[in-house]
Amino acid sequence: MSVPGWTRCAPVLLLGTACASAPAHYHTLVPAVATDPARAPDSPYRTNYPVAVERVVVPAQVDRFEMVLRRDDGEVALMENELWIAPLSEEVKNALSLDIARELGSDEGYDVGRGAPAVSIRVEIGRLDSSLGRYALIEAAWQLRAVRDTRNLMLSCNTYAYERVGSGYESLVRGHQRAVASIADQISVSVRLLASGGSWVCPTPAQPPRQ
């Protein structure tokens, strides 16, 4: 190989290295296997109730693969290298389904083709904020539908979940996992009341902190 030829190639190689894109990082809201004793198979809180999360709606602004961060000045930033492994609405639905199934001892991802579940769940998220190094926030309305003693029952509730987070995207993702788990806990409380024959009421959500 001649020296002039190498001289011509070197700038091209250096330019290619300088322009290499940053690696993408993928995140999920689906938590690892729970180790909470309250979720153990022999827990008295389990109901073995067939429950299905049928639909989860997320604001269009954040229902995407890219993570969307909220700034202090009201601006938002689209993080092209910090990605959810699936669109955010699917991530929330999968995480909710898993958390509720673990709480109640029901089948994970109940197949509605097997017949109507005892309780169907629909969730509409009105606000989902991600503030790096500060908080993860979810405001949502959820609706339960069930049949008991030939009666059609419906319960509509509002919920709020706020989790402080540390620095880094991993901490932010864990904060959202805790927020989703908090909503799943509230839904599970109402399902347990129905299963026990009690009054079907909305649980009392935590009060929003002052930001």
Where would I find each of the regions flagged by the language model?
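Compositionally biased, intrinsically disordered linkers/stalks adjacent to structured regions
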Residues: 174-211
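Extracytoplasmic/secreted envelope proteins and their assembly/folding machinery
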Residues: 89, 93, 97, 101, ...
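Short secondary-structure boundary motifs at beta->alpha junctions and helix caps
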Residues: 75-83, 149-189
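Sec-dependent bacterial lipoprotein signal peptides
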Residues: 1-17
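Surface-exposed short loop/turn segments
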Residues: 20-38, 44-47, 98, 102-150, ...
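A structural "domain/chain start" motif
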Residues: 19-88, 196-211
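Generic beta-structure capping elements
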Residues: 54-56, 70-72, 143, 147, ...
